[in-house]
Amino acid sequence: MSTNPKPAFRRILLKLSGEALMGDEGFGIDPKVLDRMAQEVKELVELGIQVGVVIGGGNLFRGEGLAKAGMNRVVGDHMGMLATVMNGLAMRDALHRAYVNARLMSAIPLKGVCDDYNWAEAISLLKSGRVVIFAAGTGNPFCTTDSAACLRGIEIEAEVVLKGTKVDGVYSDDPMKNPEAVKYDELTYTEVLDKELKVMDLAAFTMARDHDMPILVFNMNKPGALRRVVMGEEEGTMIKAK
């Protein structure tokens, strides 16, 4: 057996929830969590893996509550997209401080703040070893950041969408509420739909399924889990066609 194992993936799309950046704060960005995540991404870059990142915005803004209170959903979603840009700026800065070359691309033009999203340029940057952070979701309201992660993953021809969450995989029930919940190591797209498991919203999930994009759900708050995932070790839950 080789003493220097090769990564299981060459190019990945890492989806982080905005909540993952909060740490124990309850709101905003925990600098310690941000720096740890930047270090974990740096490890992947040093392994020669090409990394695209999509971050949610739920730590800074959640449109659902305001929509229920009467705010126009489109306005709420635009605010949510801007929250993902703020998280993207924080992540880019953390990567730069960790001496990792990173570019931030936004689906909404924000001249002087970050680059506009450009598919060909994103792939060129990934090939040159830069981390590319995709912000502002898909640029459209009514689309989640999970949809953005699957869309960007498909566009950049990533081999997998890694969904970093607060639990270490997909369970038969909510493990926070039900101690009897069983963790799955592998699932097919069909099994997820049949069992009505909550992996991501249906639009995002069916997009991944239709384009045969594997999804791997793991706990981003567990130190070393991201590296284990990309090295093909047993970590999290893999969802694919067969």
From Swiss-Prot:
<keyword id="KW-0547">Nucleotide-binding</keyword>
<feature type="binding site">
    <location>
        <position position="58"/>
    </location>
    <ligand>
        <name>ATP</name>
    </ligand>
</feature>
<keyword id="KW-0808">Transferase</keyword>
<feature type="binding site">
    <location>
        <position position="77"/>
    </location>
    <ligand>
        <name>UMP</name>
    </ligand>
</feature>
<dbReference type="GO" id="GO:0044210">
    <property type="term" value="P:'de novo' CTP biosynthetic process"/>
</dbReference>
<feature type="binding site">
    <location>
        <position position="165"/>
    </location>
    <ligand>
        <name>ATP</name>
    </ligand>
</feature>
<dbReference type="InterPro" id="IPR036393">
    <property type="entry name" value="AceGlu_kinase-like_sf"/>
</dbReference>
<keyword id="KW-0067">ATP-binding</keyword>
<dbReference type="GO" id="GO:0006225">
    <property type="term" value="P:UDP biosynthetic process"/>
</dbReference>
<feature type="binding site">
    <location>
        <begin position="15"/>
        <end position="18"/>
    </location>
    <ligand>
        <name>ATP</name>
    </ligand>
</feature>
<dbReference type="InterPro" id="IPR001048">
    <property type="entry name" value="Asp/Glu/Uridylate_kinase"/>
</dbReference>
<comment type="similarity">
    <text>Belongs to the UMP kinase family.</text>
</comment>
<dbReference type="GO" id="GO:0033862">
    <property type="term" value="F:UMP kinase activity"/>
</dbReference>
<feature type="binding site">
    <location>
        <begin position="138"/>
        <end position="145"/>
    </location>
    <ligand>
        <name>UMP</name>
    </ligand>
</feature>
<dbReference type="GO" id="GO:0005829">
    <property type="term" value="C:cytosol"/>
</dbReference>
<dbReference type="InterPro" id="IPR015963">
    <property type="entry name" value="Uridylate_kinase_bac"/>
</dbReference>
<keyword id="KW-0418">Kinase</keyword>
<feature type="binding site">
    <location>
        <position position="62"/>
    </location>
    <ligand>
        <name>ATP</name>
    </ligand>
</feature>
<comment type="subunit">
    <text>Homohexamer.</text>
</comment>
<dbReference type="InterPro" id="IPR011817">
    <property type="entry name" value="Uridylate_kinase"/>
</dbReference>
<comment type="pathway">
    <text>Pyrimidine metabolism; CTP biosynthesis via de novo pathway; UDP from UMP (UMPK route): step 1/1.</text>
</comment>
<keyword id="KW-0665">Pyrimidine biosynthesis</keyword>
<keyword id="KW-0963">Cytoplasm</keyword>
<feature type="binding site">
    <location>
        <position position="171"/>
    </location>
    <ligand>
        <name>ATP</name>
    </ligand>
</feature>
<feature type="region of interest" description="Involved in allosteric activation by GTP">
    <location>
        <begin position="23"/>
        <end position="28"/>
    </location>
</feature>
<comment type="function">
    <text>Catalyzes the reversible phosphorylation of UMP to UDP.</text>
</comment>
<feature type="binding site">
    <location>
        <position position="57"/>
    </location>
    <ligand>
        <name>UMP</name>
    </ligand>
</feature>
<dbReference type="GO" id="GO:0005524">
    <property type="term" value="F:ATP binding"/>
</dbReference>
<protein>
    <recommendedName>
        <fullName>Uridylate kinase</fullName>
        <ecNumber>2.7.4.22</ecNumber>
    </recommendedName>
</protein>
<keyword id="KW-0021">Allosteric enzyme</keyword>
<dbReference type="Pfam" id="PF00696">
    <property type="entry name" value="AA_kinase"/>
</dbReference>
<feature type="binding site">
    <location>
        <position position="174"/>
    </location>
    <ligand>
        <name>ATP</name>
    </ligand>
</feature>
